[in-house]
Amino acid sequence: RRGFKVVHMTGFFLNFLGATDSASNLGGIQMNLLFPFLIVWAIVAFIMYKGVRRGIEVVCRVTLPILMLLIVLLVIRGITLPGAVDGLNYLFQPDWSALKKPSVWVAAYGQIFFSLSIGFAIMVSYASYLPKKTDVVNSACITATANHGFEVFTAIGIFGIVGFMAGQQGVDVAEVAGGGVGLAFMTFPTAINALPAFNALFAICFFGALFIAAITSMISILQAVIASMHDKFNIDHNVATT
């Protein structure tokens, strides 16, 4: 099982992504990724050209409810699978000894900084469009609470499915659970493929949710840069977007 997992990861990073063994070796262009890459950037560029009101706000009003619906479907399916309890026990059973590991704290800081966009100027950029009398402290508390609550809710569905996969393979949940790219593009697709029914539907739910989360993150990061260029150097919005 361990050997299969290593081969699976190697195949994904080397064959599909075209990853190299050195940062100085850029490798070649992956043609299977070039077209989707250009499409995504074209979508993002169109949204950014539309501005905050007609672009970002409209996209968020449409995509975020869809994201929540997709996640709800995944969670419902995840907790109803055989073996889901094992995955949830793994998720919520604390391992206090892990707090002694610096890598755990680094991962936690990295997660929270990215999740709440701390240090990216994204919150400052978005907050600048609020009315002047807005209670910023209250808004910040609501944002942090909603973000963390949604993350835990999503984790319940993910670890339910991971627990199911561990049961199917006859291994511990710890051997199946991973993080980052490996979990999203290797472990989870394998788990979805092993579902007893409606595999395609839940694959659409998962990757649809992942796409929405990714593209809204791209938009927020770019908006911080564009707003900074506009405010600091008085550059026109469309010029800054370009």
Where are these regions (language model features)?
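Inter-helical loop and helix-membrane interface segments of multi-pass membrane transporters/permeases
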Residues: 1-49, 53, 85-106, 178-185
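Short amphipathic alpha-helical surface micro-motifs
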Residues: 29, 71-72, 224-225
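Hydrophobic, membrane-inserted alpha-helices
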Residues: 41-43, 122-124, 224-226
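C-terminal ends of transmembrane helices
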Residues: 48-54, 128, 225
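Membrane-embedded translocation segments of transport machinery
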Residues: 57, 61-215, 219, 233-234, ...
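Interfacial segments of multi-pass membrane proteins
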Residues: 228-230
